[in-house]
């Protein structure tokens, strides 16, 4: 992908040179105030004559994150990984803007839910997808990348490969890499068992060349951190989690399933 310098009003940055899209529509969406808000940004998907675009605006002083996502997306692509194609990136003072083309494919959670249907064929396909997930995360780390927030919604499954979304906190370097395994594993997912979670870790450990002792140490560490995150996020007392055990804590449809707990409270 080739990029050229771009400026409009007080915006300065780069745009894709050979892709048709409406810059004015994207800027209007960025300034419109709509979309999903997160801690550092606001995201909005918009329909255009050229397809779906994702507009992510970063209020001051977090505009540097837009440039980081742009740079990391290109670095990932150069290393053989799939990431959304940036159409437009810019700064306005200390605010930032990132516009990407829709990555296509299927959300990881949607793919797993689809493969949770009964039947030996579906079960085999689900297990294969989970093994591929562990192997791909290992490949990411081996290439020197650590994703900033590798939760399932930030992964797409497209044409037999994973696409890494939201790369504004992705960085190079090994320290903290195993945290990605905690981010992936802390979600309660329909149709995913404790054995399925272990399958991801085994594939990861195998691809990283870990021996049995190091594999067991990694698994125990990831399990402890997942339990701690569940307790912190969902306000589960540590003593309650310890009594219930990991399987019950992470079982879809179980007493600690956040979806069921929310429904009961409603």
What are these regions (language model features)?
Residues 18-113, 120-121, 132-143, 147, ...:
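Conserved ATP-binding subdomain of kinase catalytic cores across diverse folds
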Residues 150-157:
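Hydrophobic residue at the +6 position relative to the catalytic HRD Asp in the kinase catalytic loop
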Residues 157-163:
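Conserved metal-phosphate-binding beta-hairpin within the catalytic cores
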Residues 163-228:
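C-lobe/activation-segment region of protein kinase-like
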Residues 126-130:
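Short alpha-helical scaffold element within the canonical Hanks-type protein kinase domain
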Residues 62, 107, 155, 172-173:
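Conserved protein kinase catalytic core
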């Amino acid at each position: 992908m080739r990029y050229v310098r771009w400026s409009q009003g007080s915006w300065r940055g780069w745009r894709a040179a050979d892709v048709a899209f409406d810059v004015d529509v994207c800027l209007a969406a960025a300034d419109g105030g709509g979309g999903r808000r997160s801690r550092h940004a606001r995201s909005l998907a918009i329909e255009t004559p050229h397809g779906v675009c994702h507009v992510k605006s970063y209020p001051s002083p977090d505009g540097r994150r837009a440039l980081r996502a742009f740079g990391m997306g290109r670095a990932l692509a150069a290393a053989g990984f799939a990431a959304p194609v940036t159409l437009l990136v810019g700064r306005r003072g200390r605010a930032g803007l990132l516009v990407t083309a829709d990555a296509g494919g299927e959300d990881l959670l949607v793919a797993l839910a689809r493969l949770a249907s009964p039947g030996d064929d579906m079960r085999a396909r689900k297990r294969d997808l989970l093994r591929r997930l562990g192997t791909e995360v290992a490949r990411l780390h081996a290439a020197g990348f650590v994703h900033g927030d590798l939760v399932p919604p930030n992964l797409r499954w497209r044409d037999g490969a994973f696409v890494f979304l939201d790369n504004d906190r992705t960085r190079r370097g090994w320290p903290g890499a195993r945290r990605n395994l905690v981010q992936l594993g802390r979600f309660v997912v329909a149709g995913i068992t404790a054995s399925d979670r272990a399958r991801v870790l085994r594939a990861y450990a195998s691809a990283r060349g870990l021996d049995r002792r190091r594999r067991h140490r990694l698994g125990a560490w990831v399990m402890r951190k997942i339990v701690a995150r569940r307790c912190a996020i969902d306000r589960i007392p540590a003593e309650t989690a310890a009594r219930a055990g990991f399987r019950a804590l992470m079982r879809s449809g179980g007493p600690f399933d956040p979806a069921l707990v929310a429904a009961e409270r409603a």
